[in-house]
């Protein structure tokens, strides 16, 4: 598996059953986005109840993104048990969320990975200055790729992925917007704003477009609410 595909799988929840005993097993609690003017829950712990995480996320987003529910893609697609689907998260809003709008269901997957975890997955040292828009070897080019160096030195890269490649035959993913925020300490936020999937475990038709736009992803990833406290 190439580096690009490896990190995409990580962001999707790595559809293999993990070891049990992790931190979280998402409860299926839906909340409607109240828009960025709403006050988020005061607790920002990564182990907060799933409903509180969905509420905090919804408070950061425009009201028109739809109804938000924290889910487990492993449970949906692979029928994982709650114990098998438990995941340890680094960021207070890390998780997998369903977005329901206009009869369709899309997904947002947000994952903060530290340098060590990235290096294990990539098989090489993490480089915060790497240009992800540059084609490497035989990897496919990233469509509509935009790389932005932020004033604080972090680098945000976003691109579109048609998801038109072979994988799990039981699931067909729709197009998505992908984001990677590289931080100076070597950690990275990985995010997928997906139009959804069809096949095993589907919750509804694909959305006509990713649930969060490029600008909405940027605002979310660069805000303090997604960073661990302390």
Task: Give the residues covered by each predicted segment.
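Intrinsically disordered, low-complexity prosegments and terminal tails associated
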Residues: 8-230
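Conserved small/polar residues in nucleotide/adenosyl-binding loops
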Residues: 1-5
